[in-house]
Each structure stands twice: as C-alpha cells, then as structure tokens.
Amino acid sequence: MKIKELPRKAGKEVNLFNGVDLTGWEPYGTEKWYVKDGLLVCESGPDKQYGYLATRDYYDDFDLTVEFKQEADGNSGVFIRSFVEEGVKVNGWQVEVAPKGHDTGGIYESYGRGWLVQIPDEKENILKEGDWNTMRIKVQGDNVQTWLNGQEMVNLNDEKLSLIHIS
C-alpha cells in the first residue's frame, strides 16, 4: 500500500503499511486487525459490527495504490477525506470494496448523500474475486478518480470534498 502526495507538497511517496505491524495506524471498533505473513488481515469482531483501521497521518491531495484480496462475502472500502465520530461512525466518502455486483470502485458518502457513483454492470467483471486486485485512488481538489486493475471506474467532481483521512 503506497500513497503519493500530489503537487502542493513535495510529491514524495510514502509506504503506509510496513508489512510487519500496525505502526502508523489506529483501529476503531471491535474488528480484529493484524499482520500475518506480511499481509494486513481483518476479521469480524465478537459483535459483528463495523470496524475501521485509519492512518494516523492526514493527506490532502494524493494518489493511493492498494492491493487487496476479498475472500469473504463482506463489505469493505477505503474512506477518503473522512472523519470518525462516536466510536465507529465515519462521515465522508468511501471507495467501495465488495463482491461482484456491489460496486467496487464506486463512491459512497457515508452519513451523507449515499451513493454518488455506482459502477455500471458491464464493469463488475473487472473485479477478480478470490484473487489479488489493484485499486488506485487519486484525489486532487474536488476531483476523485478510481481505477480497478487498470480500468477507470469513477471520475467524480464533488465540491463537498474537504480534508481527508484514509481509513
């Protein structure tokens, strides 16, 4: 998982995950987050409620690349320009990561307007279920773009985009 800050800063690339432990990350909720064989793993907690793992650092404009493998029939995602309140309530934009037919790469505004961009049916097969996928998320000003396995999924301009916290 790598993030590159865009022009307002030096544009340096930062490895967000060291492959060893959760240094630089803050868990929210009861889900179990841990590192196994160099991979970041999440398991449902005892109460089966939402849980999140957030970076301790904040990023404004950035270009993020994440590799993921969705093995369970669960819902996940990458929150951008969002904030956590009241335990596990996250307000902001989420780039969806979910099984086929559930809009991976789409944009959902949590505790806001709901779906901003859902993925057309013809793009649902870009997701490789049970295999490794690469998600790229680029946020600059009021624009967010997503790519899944090299294919553009979303190009959205939204004037409500503000400060960001990756979760």
What are the language-model segments listed below?
Residues M1-S167:
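Carbohydrate-interacting regions of secretory-pathway proteins
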